C-alpha cells in the first residue's frame, strides 16, 4: 500500500465477497492496522433488483459504510430502486459510473443530475395517452384479445 499513499483515491475491489467473509474482514483489518485512512463504500449496480440491493447493504453494513458508489447508470431502465436504498439507508452517493471505462466514466454526482436522470427514465417508460387509447380500443373491439 505504500506506493499508493500519495494517491487521492484508491479503489479496492472485494471481488464479490460477502460482508461477513473472513478474508474480507482480514483485508479491512490490515488496512486499519496500517493506519491508512480508509472509507468503505458499497458498490451498487443500478441495474440490480431491490432484493439484491437490500441483501448487499445488509451484508456490508457492518463494515462501517461511508456511502455508496452507483454503477451502470448508462444501462439502467430505472434509478428508483437504487436511489431508494441510498436514501432509505442514508448512504451518501460518493461516485457514479455511466460507462465501462474507469476512471473516465467515474464521476462525482450532483443531486439535481441524478434526480433529472431518474425522472427522465421514468417519463420514458410511461406510454402516451394515444398509445393507451389504441390499446384499450383494440381490446374493446376485439374480445378474443381480452380472453388471453
Give residue spans per PLM region.
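Conserved beta-strand/loop subsegment of P-loop NTPase cores
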Residues: 37-44, 61-103
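Short, solvent-exposed amphipathic alpha-helical segments in soluble enzyme
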Residues: 27-29, 57-61, 83-88, 111
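NTP-binding/hydrolysis catalytic cores, primarily Walker-type P-loop NTPases
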Residues: 86-148
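P-loop NTPase motor core
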Residues: 45-60
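Conserved ATPase-coupling elements of RecA-like P-loop NTPase cores
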Residues: 19-27, 52-54, 78-81
Amino acid at each position: 500500500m505504500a506506493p499508493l499513499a500519495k494517491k487521492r483515491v484508491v479503489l479496492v475491489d472485494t471481488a464479490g465477497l460477502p460482508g461477513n467473509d473472513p478474508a474480507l474482514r482480514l483485508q479491512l483489518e490490515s488496512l486499519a492496522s496500517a493506519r491508512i485512512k480508509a472509507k468503505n463504500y458499497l458498490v451498487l449496480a443500478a441495474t440490480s433488483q431491490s432484493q439484491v440491493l437490500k441483501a448487499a447493504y445488509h451484508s456490508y453494513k457492518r463494515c462501517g459504510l461511508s456511502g455508496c458508489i452507483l454503477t451502470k447508470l448508462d444501462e439502467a431502465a430505472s434509478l428508483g430502486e437504487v436511489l431508494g436504498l441510498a436514501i432509505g439507508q442514508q448512504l451518501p452517493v460518493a461516485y457514479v459510473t455511466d460507462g465501462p471505462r474507469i476512471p473516465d466514466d467515474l464521476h462525482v454526482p450532483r443531486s439535481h443530475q441524478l434526480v433529472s436522470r431518474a425522472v427522465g427514465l421514468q417519463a420514458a417508460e410511461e406510454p402516451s395517452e394515444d398509445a393507451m387509447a389504441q390499446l384499450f380500443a383494440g381490446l374493446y373491439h376485439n374480445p378474443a384479445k381480452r380472453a388471453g
